[in-house]
Amino acid sequence: MKRSVAVWLLVGLSLGVPQFGKGDICDPNPCENGGICLPGLADGSFSCECPDGFTDPNCSSVVEVASDEEEPTSAGPCTPNPCHNGGTCEISEAYRGDTFIGYVCKCPRGFNGIHCQHNINECEVEPCKNGGICTDLVANYSCECPGEFMGRNCQYKCSGPLGIEGGIISNQQITASSTHRALFGLQKWYPYYARLNKKGLINAWTAAENDRWPWIQINLQRKMRVTGVITQGAKRIGSPEYIKSYKIAYSNDGKTWAMYKVKGTNEDMVFRGNIDNNTPYANSFTPPTKAQYVRLYPQVCRRHCTLRMELLGCELSGCSEPLGMKSGHIQDYQITASSIFRTLNMDMFTWEPRKARLDKQGKVNAWTSGHNDQSQWLQVDLLVPTKVTGIITQGAKDFGHVQFVGSYKLAYSNDGEHWTVYQDEKQRKDKVFQGNFDNDTHRKNVIDPPIYARHIRILPWSWYGRNTLRSELLGCTEEE
């Protein structure tokens, strides 16, 4: 802090300052407004080192500077404003130690100090989560997030499967440069077989032998944040085949493509692939990419270029992670229903609401309502108000009989008693969501605008066989 130094040699009462006896001339401090007393060389002499804005022998007057040409004049303690960085000066009977100063500075966010002169280092409190790197800025901070996280504080996870394995991404959305045909054309290894963990005799995509620059392409149908990819090989005629390395390209229109680069360079990134035909191998994109179309270009293959895969990422909002139906984070007691069904009226075949978890396995692996009508519901208590941005549904089989919900409505509540049915904003009526077409394929619906609520109800509106449901909610608990 700059200080003006007024040096005055005081002898006796000649300048109106009491004569001090022997001892410390600066005790008590004769300097006002936070001035620092400095003993002089001669007995009874001292000087006052005054803070900015104060003058006179004992720092008792405030300096007002109207312009470079005008002489300083005395004014109130807030003129000129002693507060830095946009701080607001307020007249106050304030003390700094034992000294009356007459004002306080109200500092804007990001600054502190008596005169708001210090920039706060927000990174000291480690605001960046999940391995994010914090950079302190002037009155602010920024977080550089790992590829699979996003948000101001890297608080949103963005690494969920985008739907190749589960079937949210349809066959028509998966295309390729070529298809391998074997056994006189009877076996066709189409691109839409390239689904992670797919089973069967023909369970992957294989490029044609004469395809010198093969690729497989995923159309996500809208721009999404893509943070990684999982690859897997397969066996063809008993022989392991897989992709050892590959490149990634992306596009927003399917025509103009950009290759994913090594960070900070213009060099195409070559990703490590698989080392056998069955073990999945994941690569993350740091930084992630935002695109509607993603292409994978095999570089080195074992025998033929054979692939099963999944893309990882989330909606652009970043708030579209599974809330815990499949993982079990949502516990059994949080899932209730209007009624339940028992096959053959036997307790061991009870289709309880707690079984309504996406991809649940077993003979009894879903919720089925006791009645087939439009008054049935499956309810999830999220325990706290939560932003819900999507839902995935799935049917099931009861002793070989295919059952699923073909369409449904959604309702939400914060107290579990008063419910609101989600509306179609354009048509201004209850929104009916498209459900499933079979018992096993995932069907995802985006909830836009999102729901903010603690309790969510799925209201079956049409069904095949019986109201049978496995499900997952997508969203996040919002944090600053």
Swiss-Prot record:
CDD domains: EGF_CA, FA58C. Residues 24-60, 74-117, 119-155 form the EGF-like domain. SMART domains: EGF, EGF_CA, FA58C. It comes from the Eukaryota. Its main location: secreted. GO terms for biological process: cell adhesion. Disulfide bonds join 26-37, 31-48, 50-59, 78-89, 83-105, 107-116, 123-134, 128-143, 145-154, 158-314, 301-305, 319-476. One of its GO terms (molecular function) is calcium ion binding. Residues 158-314, 319-476 form the F5/8 type C domain. A motif (Cell attachment site) lies at residues 96-98. It is found in: Secreted. InterPro entries: EGF-like_Ca-bd_dom, EGF-like_CS, EGF-like_dom, EGF-type_Asp/Asn_hydroxyl_site, EGF_Ca-bd_CS, FA58C, Galactose-bd-like_sf, Neuropilin_MCO_CoagFactor. GO terms for cellular component: extracellular region; plasma membrane. Residues 1-23 form the signal peptide. Keywords: Cell adhesion, Developmental protein, Disulfide bond, EGF-like domain, Repeat, Secreted, Signal. Promotes adhesion of endothelial cells through interaction with the alpha-v/beta-3 integrin receptor. Inhibits formation of vascular-like structures. May be involved in regulation of vascular morphogenesis of remodeling in embryonic development. This is EGF-like repeat and discoidin I-like domain-containing protein 3. It comes from Pongo abelii (Sumatran orangutan). The lineage of its organism: Eukaryota, Metazoa, Chordata, Craniata, Vertebrata.
